Each structure stands twice: as C-alpha cells, then as structure tokens.
Amino acid sequence: METMGRHVISELWGCDFDKLNDMDFIEKTFVNAALKSGAEVREVAFHKFAPQGVSGVVIISESHLTIHSFPEHGYASIDVYTCGDLDPNVAADYIAEELRAETRENIEIPRGMGPVQVKQAKAKAQAL
C-alpha cells in the first residue's frame, strides 16, 4: 500500500548516561542522522533538563526526528518520521549506534493512506 510517510519508533535501552545527558552531542547526532538519510534540515530545537535529560526535535523538509532521553534509566525514546523516498531506518540506526544502545526495539508505522498496520522495523543488527 502506498503511504504518505514512514514512522519508525525506537525504544533504546542500555545507552551511555553521559551521551544521553549531553545536549550538544545529541543535537549533533540528530542533525547528522537526518543528513545521512538524505533529509534537508529546516529547524533544530533541543532542551536540557535539570538534573538530567534532553528532549529535542530536528524538523526536516520530509518530516521530523525527535528524542526524549532518560539518562538515569539508560533509556531514550526516538521517533523518525519521513515522507517521500527517504528510509527512516537509516537515521534510526545511526542514532542507536551513536548512543551505544545495548537493546533496541522498533516498530514502523505507515502513515496517511489507510488503516494503520504496525510492523517491526528492520533495525540493523547490533552486537551486545
């Protein structure tokens, strides 16, 4: 079925505390992830929480990438939504690698053209 976009939702566990708590590192990682997927970056907004955690969004011409990090749990929730021919898994894989995620669960949701059919996203295999 033809869709308007692909939305990958990643649950990242066992991530490095310092990386999850470093707003500049996360911002750079997300911009690089967007560029590696072939996206055109439009806007970038990130916020550092006290005592820890980062939330942010990279708006791309093709949609968006978001993160909410919980360093105290080694956890990050990631969304990568792309329209057109871009593969959101390219960006999601890069982010998981950069955050050194030990465990990753993904789902991919086709958006905008009919009933939602949730499927496991094809995540790049990672050695633990």
Curated annotation (Swiss-Prot):
The active site is at 63 (schiff-base intermediate with substrate), 68 (proton acceptor), 83 (proton donor). Binds 1 pyruvoyl group covalently per subunit. Catalyzes the decarboxylation of S-adenosylmethionine to S-adenosylmethioninamine (dcAdoMet), the propylamine donor required for the synthesis of the polyamines spermine and spermidine from the diamine putrescine. The keyword Lyase applies. It catalyses: S-adenosyl-L-methionine + H(+) = S-adenosyl 3-(methylsulfanyl)propylamine + CO2. One of its GO terms (cellular component) is cytosol. The record marks 62-63 as: Cleavage (non-hydrolytic). It comes from Bacillus licheniformis (strain ATCC 14580 / DSM 13 / JCM 2505 / CCUG 7422 / NBRC 12200 / NCIMB 9375 / NCTC 10341 / NRRL NRS-1264 / Gibson 46). This is S-adenosylmethionine decarboxylase proenzyme. Its cofactor is pyruvate. HAMAP family: AdoMetDC_1. Pathway: Amine and polyamine biosynthesis; S-adenosylmethioninamine biosynthesis; S-adenosylmethioninamine from S-adenosyl-L-methionine: step 1/1. PANTHER family: S-ADENOSYLMETHIONINE DECARBOXYLASE PROENZYME (PTHR33866:SF2). The lineage of its organism: Bacteria, Bacillati, Bacillota, Bacilli, Bacillales. GO terms for biological process: spermidine biosynthetic process. Belongs to the prokaryotic AdoMetDC family. Type 1 subfamily. Its EC number is 4.1.1.50. One of its GO terms (molecular function) is adenosylmethionine decarboxylase activity. It is an enzyme of class 4 (lyase). Heterotetramer of two alpha and two beta chains arranged as a dimer of alpha/beta heterodimers. The modification Pyruvic acid (Ser) is found at residue 63. Keywords: Autocatalytic cleavage, Decarboxylase, Lyase, Polyamine biosynthesis, Pyruvate, S-adenosyl-L-methionine, Schiff base, Spermidine biosynthesis, Zymogen. Pfam families: AdoMet_dc. Is synthesized initially as an inactive proenzyme. Formation of the active enzyme involves a self-maturation process in which the active site pyruvoyl group is generated from an internal serine residue via an autocatalytic post-translational modification. Two non-identical subunits are generated from the proenzyme in this reaction, and the pyruvate is formed at the N-terminus of the alpha chain, which is derived from the carboxyl end of the proenzyme.
